[in-house]
Amino acid sequence: MTARFAWLLVGVLAGAALVAIPWESTSDAGTGPATIRITDRLLSLKRVDIGARGTSPGDVEVVRHRLYDRTRARNVIGRAELVCHFVDTRRSRSCRGTYILPRGKIVVGGAIQYHQFYVLAVTGGTGLYDNARGTLTVTRTARRPVRDLVVFRLAG
C-alpha cells in the first residue's frame, strides 16, 4: 500500500508540474513605454525601374542609412534598411524596413510620400525590442550629406 501511495504522489506531482509549464511561449523582453532618439545618415538610395519608364507603380526603392548616437554624432550604433514599392506615378510608396541597433532590431512599415518627413508603424522587433509596438518619426535635418532625426516612440 505504501508503494502505491508513493507512485500516486509522484504521478500527482508530475501532473502538477506539467500544468505549471506554459503551453504558449511568451517573451520577457517587453520594451515598455520608451522613446529612442538617434540620428542617421543616408548611405545609398537605389531605384529599380520596373515596367513603364520613369516612376510607375511597382518600381522599387532600396534605402540604406547608418545610425548614430544622438549625443555623440560620430558614434555609429547601427544601420537601417528599407525597401519601398511605388504605388502610383508620383511619390506614394509602401515601405518595410529594419533598424538594426546594438540590443536588437526594430521592424517598421507603412506609407512614405516624402523622405523629408514621415511616420511609420513599429510592427515588431527582436532582442530588447521583441514584440515592440509604436511609431517611428523621421525628420530631415540636413540635405548634404542627408541626415535625419529618428525618433521611436514604443508602447510595449
Which residues make up each language-model segment?
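Compositionally biased amphipathic helical and low-complexity segments enriched in hydrophobic
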Residues: 9-10, 14, 19, 121, ...
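Alpha-helical segments embedded in low-complexity/disordered contexts
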Residues: 11, 22, 39-41
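C-terminal region of N-terminal signal peptides and the immediate post-cleavage residues
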Residues: 16-33
